[in-house]
Amino acid sequence: MEVLLMKRIFALLLAAVSLISLTACAQPEAKTASKYQLADPQYPQMAPYPDETKFSRPNGDFDSDGFNQVYNAWQADRRKQTDQPEGYTDALDSYLHAVIPQLLTGGSGENKVCSPINIYMALAMLAEVTDSESREQILALLGSGDVNALRAEAAAVWNANYCDDGAVTSILANSLWLSDKISFKQEAMDALARYYYASSFRGEMGSAAFDKTLQDWIGQQTGGLLKEQASGLTMDKETILALASTIYFRAKWNGEFSEANTVPDTFHADSGDTTCDFMRQRGTNTYYWSDRFSAVSKPLE
């Protein structure tokens, strides 16, 4: 029974986390209450990113005192998010080395995209609501000694990647969906909200109304950018538990590309050559190369 249940959970887990918004222009939609909701996470409040143009006086002087006050408040909130316990990424690094090759190999010439952080959070939630051998297997994959350690590590990962200051939006949204045919412990739902910043819902699996709630949740968390993909996401009536994790990321380049330097060129793909626009920029930067690919670092603000 446990093996069958885990197969059902993982099948929907992998389908759900494939809906990922890596870059975005729209803003996340406002949350709406749902009759199905069991617990709702509270995201950190952040001071807004300082806009220098708002501190220029009519006579041309710059209000440095006012700017510094806003800047210091913003910097304190950013530091609060990024200053996580030393070594919290150790287990995450081990997980990434184990998982990424499995996710990105064997594409038969097709491009692949994945967000290992989303899968990490989904697996962490799954460990929270399972026990026995299933939990031990997940903890081993994630490199965590026990659930208490996993809670601390997952919360640190989530907070280190969270930002919502008006200039950068980076939100990992997580959720758990339960069948109304099974019982649950409210303290477990509260733990998901507290440590994994996850919403939890309970309803009739396979019903149009519950599917619509899932689709709406995906849309709200991704600024409506995945409306088409989310509209086809449904849960089978025999499903007991489903997990969904999205990432909404929006930021500016540290140095924007000049449109005048964008020119058509040849892109060499496995399927053949094609002509497309290439953004070009000159400068000193970090460059990585290997036998099979090369990459360049491009910082964001």
Predicted regions and their residues:
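Detector for small/aliphatic-rich hydrophobic stretches
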Residues: 3-5, 10, 25-204
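Non-catalytic, conformational "gating/processing" segments within enzyme and secreted inhibitor domains
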Residues: 50-53, 109-110, 114, 119, ...
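Hydrophobic core
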Residues: 18-22
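Sec-dependent signal peptide hydrophobic core
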Residues: 10-17
